[in-house]
From Swiss-Prot:
Residue segments, region Disordered: 1-20
Keywords: Lectin, Repeat
Protein family: Belongs to the jacalin lectin family.
Protein name stated in the entry: Jacalin-related lectin 13
UniProt xrefs under SMART domains: Jacalin (SM00915)
Domain Jacalin-type lectin intervals: 2-147, 150-295, 307-461
Amino acid sequence: MTQKLESVGSERKSSEYMWDDGSEHDDVTKIYVRGGTKGIEFIKFGYVKAGELLDGSFHGYSDTGFTQMFEIDHRKNEHLLSVEGYFDYYNDIMYAIQFKTNLKISEIMGYEYSGHKFTLAMEGKKIIGFHGFADVNLRALGAYVTWITPARMEAKGGKGGNEWDDGGDYEAVTKIHGRSDHKGIKDIIFDYVDKDGHPKSETHGPTSGQGYVLEPFEINHLDKEYLMSIDGYYDDASGVIQALQFKTNMKTSELMGYYDDDAVKFTIGCTVNKIIGFHGHAGKNLYSLGAYFTTLPLTKLEYEDSFREKLPKNGASGNLWDDGSFQGVKKVHIYYDGYSVRCVRFDYDDDGKVESREHGPKIVAAVQEGGFVLDYPNEVITSVEGIATVVNTGLSFSTGNVMIKSLTFKTSKGRTSPTFGNVFGNYLSEFKLESQGCAIVGFHGRSSYNSIHGLGAYFFPMPPSHDGKALEEQGGDGGLGGV
């Protein structure tokens, strides 16, 4: 069912300038935003309906400024999930806007000024249309949302038994256990948690108690652990599944059961989705297994949250920048001196193309340049550690402006970059950006004409490696990559 989210922004709406793209679309495909110092001038959306691309109208007025475009690939099952923006109610201007899909996040479009931050989103739903108010500027924006249908992968294995289906309306799989006998998996039990946090258990196969108990596999969804893939083996003659092995973004289960040398192997999984439900066939044994998938979440860690103390001005030193998210980080460039980190540049992987984003001034007297190269895609950044200080104060950490003094990067291969910057001084505070089982896929922060003032990151769960083990830190230090 489609639901209308009321527009956010100007309270002085005129019916003459109201617009509505409607909700009769399957997905949003392209977004054009023209921004300037006077705020968002116009916005335009492209949609898709039954495979046909639809070009929307311009909403607003084109003046001096710059146009940014954000593309959403509906062919890869990518959906628009949310919109964030900044609106100044005093001046009646929308200054900045940012879009998030199930696969990536756009860079911030426009400029962040002091104003009200708003969000258009609804849990478990995607945006399929927009409405709002625009005259010489975009003044208000609302949206239409509808439920996201989980993707269903057909059952794999042999033929036999009766069909069963747990559905795909759960939040997560939390535990897998069962029994096995000389033929293979006898019964299997899946523990789920629904979207309201309530547990539920489903058993498939006989419940006679015969066979030996398999080692249970628990998944801590509260710690952002997600079931991502399954390897299975079945006997082609009997059709019985002989063994199963489950993989999350953090660990791999023991092999449940056994398999013959001539067993047929199958895999269920997708690197950008998590498994939230199962279906298949079972009788005296488990014969086949299929799954329901939904998208993995991107995690945004704010630089404010990574400090041990509350930041001066709530961390608002300098101007906001946001690169959004990409497939991964290939190289970092750091420009620093004895006082602070002056400039950062990140080389990202954007579907095989290198996209670079630079923030802060690198032309400063006595600045040093350092770089750290990743063996991407086999190696990813898993954490950033840094030291910040406060300048223009003789009192305490609670006043003044924050400046980043040093940065250190760690990777999934256990390498640690050199420390870029100076770790000594007064009013120092350490911070760390890390999300267990996840890789950094983008950065955001604050900078000014002379320094980097804050650094945050976007994290995405890491897929299991080919040997069945999740990419994780393994110890040991690495050296300086090429500059």
